[in-house]
Swiss-Prot record:
Record gene name: IFT22
SUPFAM superfamilies assigned: P-loop containing nucleoside triphosphate hydrolases (SSF52540)
Protein name (database record): Intraflagellar transport protein 22 homolog
Functional note: Small GTPase-like component of the intraflagellar transport (IFT) complex B.
Similarity field: Belongs to the small GTPase superfamily. Rab family.
Recorded GO CC terms: centrosome; cilium; intraciliary transport particle B
Disulphides: none
Residues that, per the record, bind GTP: 10-17, 63-67, 123-126
Length: 185
């Protein structure tokens, strides 16, 4: 059974924990409480399998605190990560500026492929859903960008996340197959 480690990173108060709880069907949190360091959520998704035989997959979603005071812990969090989801609040301009730092640190410096990264522009309840006006500078404009609004269309983000998990598992399966073939040859 394949086990994938996915990091949820991004600025403070961007909605990482709310999204992580929703996507893993964990408990809801009603009051804001900043994540201290990291929370690890383990889950399985029946829609994601590692091959045509329907072998299940396990996931660890690492909900990482966005405060810079945890920066010294980031190398340990990044170890053996298979994917990175950068969550930001699309309504806060400073979050857009910070995204390049998150991308550089968690994706580029870890030699992850862009396909292993997804951006989520999270819209908090009552903020409106302005999907059209978000322009990102290179290299962020090459990444998969998904808007999430748990109030108006929660299933859209769930379906996009499942697609993302499937791509991570496919990549892991292909890598494992290549490794097995190299051992046999």
């Amino acid at each position: 059974m394949l086990k994938a480690k996915i990091l949820f990173v991004g600025p403070c108060e961007s909605g990482k924990t709310v999204l992580a709880n929703f996507l893993t069907e964990s408990s809801d949190i009603t009051e804001y409480s900043p994540t201290q360091g990291v929370r690890i959520l383990e889950f399985e998704n029946p829609h994601v399998t590692s091959n045509n035989k329907g072998t299940g997959c396990e996931f660890e979603l690492w909900d990482c605190g966005g405060d810079a005071k945890f920066e010294s812990c980031w190398p340990a969090l990044m170890k053996d990560a298979h994917g990175v989801v950068i969550v930001f609040n699309a309504d806060i301009p400073s979050h857009r500026k910070e995204m390049e730092m998150w991308y550089s640190c968690f994706v580029q410096q870890q030699s992850l492929q862009d396909t292993q990264c997804m951006l989520i522009a999270h819209h908090k309840p009552g903020s409106g859903d302005d999907k059209g006006s978000l322009s990102l500078s290179p290299p962020l404009n090459k990444l998969k960008l998904v808007h999430s609004n748990l109030e108006d269309d929660p299933e859209e983000i769930r379906m996009e996340f499942i697609k993302y998990l499937k791509s991570i598992i496919n990549s892991m399966s292909e890598s494992r197959d290549r490794e097995e073939m190299s051992i046999m040859t």
